């Protein structure tokens, strides 16, 4: 059921003292809920995730397929079964109409641009969407301003994880046009990992000390863009200032 894809961080920022504790967390993307059958699938996913005992979960967007309030609420209910904190960011499909994210804001308040800390690590969740657009997008001025205002408040020496919906890896399909403007703001920080969605497929790219990844989708009624069939999520371990991760495949439910 598990297929391994371990990767070590390559470098550590000079002079940084890694946190002493280690912990695990899950990363899931592109669940695209659009019917009750998707709810049964997502509950199955959550039960498999519970076996891995992560301390929290990151969902990097496209929770639902068409931004409906009732679908977002259903995803919230399914994810609550994990019994652990779930931190999400908005995907383009989580908008109801081109620029309307009101349903997402109502169901998941304060989940646009934000930070949290865990085990000596810093986590930054960002909105990289351009409304409903899926290609040739730009990261909003509002997000870039938020980064400018809040990134200096973080400890540049402590390890940091960035999670956001649109793929930021160099050359990955649907990468926002102004990704470099965002990444340049993180160059002086101890960024160790970047988790993205939107492109349904496994990609891995370097950025300074970090590895930037996308993953296969974890949706019942959506496929992968890279032609693969596997659905699943990452289980990640933060230890000694580095991140490792492995892919947990979710098999189809019995007929």
Predicted regions mapped to residue ranges:
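N-terminal active-site segment of His-dependent metallophosphoesterases
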Residues: 7-74
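Acidic, His/Gly-rich catalytic cores of divalent-metal-dependent hydrolytic chemistry
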Residues: 240-255
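Residue-level marker for buried hydrophobic side chains located in beta-strands
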Residues: 25-27, 57-59, 88, 162, ...
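Cleavable N-terminal signal peptides
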Residues: 3, 13-14, 143
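Short acidic, glycine-rich surface-loop motifs adjacent to enzyme active sites
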Residues: 154-171
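Short, solvent-exposed loop/turn segments at secondary-structure junctions
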Residues: 67, 169-175
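Active-site glycine-centered loops adjacent to acidic/histidine catalytic or metal-binding residues
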Residues: 30, 61-62, 91-92, 165, ...
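Extended active-site neighborhood of metal-dependent phosphoesterases/phosphodiesterases
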Residues: 17, 69-159, 178-193, 203-239, ...
